[in-house]
Amino acid sequence: MEIYDIIIIGGGPAGISAGIYAVSRGKNVVVIEKEKVGGLIGSVSTVTHYAGIMEGETGSTFAARLEKQEKNAGVSIVYETVQKVSLKGEYKTVVTDKGTYQAQKVILANGTTPRKLGIPGEDELVGRGIGRNAAGEGANFSGKHIYVVGGADGAVKEALYLAQFAE
């Protein structure tokens, strides 16, 4: 088993930034990401409140730029689901669904996940009437009534984006 200097849990903006910086300082790093580089921000219609964002940039283009920078920097990334973390001892251990990793340091950059409504049948209807990615799924709802459930400016921003498709 290879022992890393740093294990980073999460491939969103924070995790990728930490990985790029650590590699630039000569550290042996692995980023563990369960789905895709960019995390949740990769699914938003327009990215705001991040340094270096191009005006009107979508979440998917931002995530693609993160992935390109991560690859160009030589950051190692694996797509696995973390199941257990032990931070005891000199070497920390991270167990995933595909293997075990050890490092002197662990950075938690695990981000966020969309909140569920908690209504019966919600999980079964994702992709068949319930969407969680306005930028990627909005056109699928063209000419239909669209309801947005969420809080703060993020929900308003997505509702404004989806208005172009709604009845």
Locate the predicted segments by residue:
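Generic secondary-structure signature for well-ordered alpha-helical cores
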Residues: 71-78, 108, 164-167
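Alpha-helical elements of the RecA-like P-loop NTPase motor core of helicases
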Residues: 39, 117, 157
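Rossmann-like dinucleotide/flavin-binding elements
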Residues: 3-4, 8-34, 126, 133-167
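FAD-binding core/adjacent interface of flavoenzyme oxidoreductases
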Residues: 1-9, 25, 76-144
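N-terminal glycine-rich anion-binding loops that anchor highly charged ligand groups
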Residues: 31-43
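A generic "binding-loop/recognition-motif" signal
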Residues: 12, 37, 46, 81, ...
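N-terminal Rossmann-like dinucleotide/flavin-binding domain of flavoprotein oxidoreductases
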Residues: 42-100
